[in-house]
Amino acid sequence: STSYGAILDNPDLLVACLIGDGEAETAATATAWHLNKFINPATSGAVLPILHLNGYKISGPTIFGRMTNRELKSLFYGYGYEPMIVEGKDAVIYEKMASILEDAYQKIISIQKKARSGTVVVSPRFPMIILKTPKGWTGIKKLKGQKIEGNALSHQVVIPNAKTDKVELKALDKWLTSYNFRELFDASKGFVDDIRELMPEEGFKMGSNKHTFGGEQVVKNL
């Protein structure tokens, strides 16, 4: 609902809104899916909802996680969206996601151009993305006979006794070193140059964008 509020009468703004599948089934968010019905693409911006579906919330399965792709597409099509599904368990999913994001962006621009050229667009069907990955993906897969990745357990404190338990400490070390931090950070300047080049310029970072906090900056440096 906050994302949709931000784009009202703000035609140049596109908000990518990431929603977890547990969050998505709560009352307030479940209702907010229908706000697309109040958007005029001629005068307002657009929201690109991204439902991150990993099948579990903090202590159990989610509703969306128990639905087939066909059921998910039917549901969100009924909500007025054009659903696009991305799923996978390996690094290829990043390329798939990049491609789908570009497709979704072009669809949004096409709808807006048509509406702003004077054509009456009734009930525009904006895209939304369903990103399906395992719960706790890239984390600890199993520990002491319990399945962690792909389970609600990955949402808990997985290794509470790593300080004293050698098995848990080894699992923690294997997990964290799998991210190859030495390839990402430099001891003297933090992030390596390849990472720094990907960072947005000042003014374009999410935390400094006025749309993320409702207006011009109200907290200033002393």
Mark where each language-model region is.
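Conserved acidic/glycine
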Residues: E23, A46-L222
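Thiamine diphosphate
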Residues: S1-L48, E95, S99-R116
